[in-house]
Regions:
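Structural signature of hydrophobic alpha-helical transmembrane segments
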Residues: 40-53, 92-101, 194-206
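Hydrophobic, membrane-inserted alpha-helices
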Residues: 27-34, 58, 78-86, 102-109, ...
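N-terminal signal-anchor module of multipass membrane proteins
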Residues: 1-63
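A generic, well-ordered mixed alpha/beta core segment in the N-terminal half of proteins
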Residues: 77-151
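Hydrophobic alpha-helical transmembrane segments
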Residues: 21, 25, 44-48, 76-80, ...
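Short, amphipathic, aromatic/basic-enriched membrane-interface segments that mark the entry/exit
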Residues: 11-21, 62-74, 91-93, 192-202, ...
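Long hydrophobic alpha-helical segments that form multi-pass transmembrane helix bundles
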Residues: 118-209
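C-terminal ends of transmembrane helices
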Residues: 6-9, 56-68, 106-117, 210-221
Length: 236
């Protein structure tokens, strides 16, 4: 009988790898809800499409490697990779952009290194970097917060039937880069210093903070990594 080696952690407790992955997916739901509220249904469409593409890509590469497909798909790592990448993409992303990013993340950044636990880099972020370098225009087209298109418009953006130019707007990072060196203009610009939650970005950040607190409360993560990351951003 052939033995199937599973990825770590090799424990006898109830929290297996799939359970941990599902908890992280649950933690993204507040962020997904707020992104949908502020930017429309494009993020939901992206997530669903990315998950489907990730599962198909994972199944094909597992089949090619002679690995049991169902056994490895149930660890939810491909689903989590797809969700994280889709949440990082603009809600105006066309279908092919998401497909390229997810395919590269699963096939190259994850499976070519041997699968879960063997890849040196986060597959979702590898896919994101590939898209940012290869398609910088498409990756920086965001809808203005609070001006969410309808479900039909979001679908038309996804399929490429509706041009994104008339709906997209500058992000805070775009504005900061444009006005860098001109502190007076930067300080008075509404997109950076608007009324609390008036521009939507604060609510997005708070929603993902809520997800992080959920993971800490469930002991899925500890406070050290997020605090260290934020300190690295804040300290010179």
């Amino acid at each position: 009988m052939a033995l199937i080696s599973s990825t770590s952690p090799h424990t006898t407790v109830s929290n297996n790898t799939g359970a941990f992955m599902r908890q992280v997916i649950y933690a993204t739901l507040p962020g997904l809800a707020v992104l949908t509220w502020q930017f429309g249904w494009g993020t939901v469409i992206n997530v669903l499409w990315a998950v489907g593409a990730a599962l198909v890509s994972e199944a094909l590469i597992l089949k090619a490697r002679g690995r049991p497909v169902a056994f490895y798909l149930k660890d939810y790592s491909a689903v989590l990779t797809a969700v994280l990448l889709a949440l990082a993409l603009p809600p105006t992303s066309p279908w092919w952009l998401t497909l390229i990013g997810v395919g590269f993340a699963i096939v190259v950044a994850k499976q070519l290194y041997g699968g879960l636990g063997m890849n040196p880099f986060n597959p979702a972020m590898v896919g994101y970097v590939l898209l940012l370098i290869s398609f910088p225009v498409a990756m920086t087209q965001w809808i203005a917060p609070g001006e969410a298109p309808s479900l039909m418009q979001s679908w038309q953006l996804f399929t490429g039937q509706l041009p994104v130019d008339g709906l997209s707007g500058a992000t805070p990072l775009d504005t900061f880069r444009t006005w860098a060196g001109n502190e007076s203009e930067l300080a008075s610009h509404g997109i950076l210093h608007g009324q609390f939650a008036g521009l939507g970005w604060e609510w997005v950040n708070l929603a993902f903070l809520l997800g992080g607190l959920y993971l800490i409360s469930r002991t899925i993560i500890t406070w050290h990594i997020p605090v260290g990351f934020m300190a690295g951003l804040a300290l010179p």
